[in-house]
């Protein structure tokens, strides 16, 4: 019988609360609630598919860049199944975005469109090919399948570093012209830090 994947120890990093505080300062509470809801459903999507495949989670840690899962058995899955786990969160967000948009055409227009937008933004953000986001993991898995793990990790690391540096430059530019641009800059430098921290890690280190 597989271990229960939801019996993991849950930790919340200070960076998560800092991001929530910064978002609350520059955004309406409705937007903050929409983003937090979308993020929660995103992570539940990952966990639901992991449970389906019998993957146990020992530790669940929330950070400003998402959730870090200590799931040693995840690396034992075939590339295809691990890719499904990786993209499960984004799939949930896209499904919810479509559902909310359709609902917004009939009722609660403003609320539905705000929450649908949050799901779309979170999905797009997570598809960026930057470690530790889902897009980078999906890219690494695809490249590893065709070219081998070593090549996949090297190429993903190079792409991740280039993209995170470009995002930091864009974040600095936006922070000079937009009231909320510094929040984007904060997230961009957080991604750069995450990329540098995880460069060189072997297959099996998971952030989803």
Question: What are the functions of these language-model segments?
Answer:
Residues 1-208:
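Hydrophobic transmembrane alpha-helices and their immediate loop junctions
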């Amino acid at each position: 019988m597989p271990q229960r994947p939801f019996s993991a120890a849950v930790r919340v990093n200070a960076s998560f609360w800092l991001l929530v505080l910064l978002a609350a300062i520059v955004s309406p509470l409705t937007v903050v609630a929409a983003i937090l809801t979308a993020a929660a459903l995103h992570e539940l999507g990952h966990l639901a598919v992991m449970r389906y495949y019998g993957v146990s989670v020992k530790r669940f840690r929330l950070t400003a860049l998402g959730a870090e899962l200590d799931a040693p058995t995840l690396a034992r899955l075939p590339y295809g199944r691990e890719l499904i786990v990786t993209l499960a969160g984004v799939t949930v967000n896209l499904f919810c975005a479509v559902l909310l948009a359709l609902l917004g055409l009939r009722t609660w227009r403003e609320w539905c469109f705000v929450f649908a937008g949050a799901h779309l933004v979170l999905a797009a953000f997570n598809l960026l090919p930057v470690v530790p986001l889902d897009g980078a993991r999906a890219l690494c898995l695809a490249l590893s399948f065709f070219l081998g793990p070593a090549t996949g990790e090297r190429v993903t690391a190079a792409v991740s570093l280039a993209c995170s540096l470009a995002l930091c430059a864009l974040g600095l530019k936006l922070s000079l012209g937009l009231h909320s641009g510094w929040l984007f800059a904060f997230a961009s430098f957080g991604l750069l830090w995450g990329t540098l921290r995880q460069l060189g890690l072997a297959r099996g280190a998971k952030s989803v």
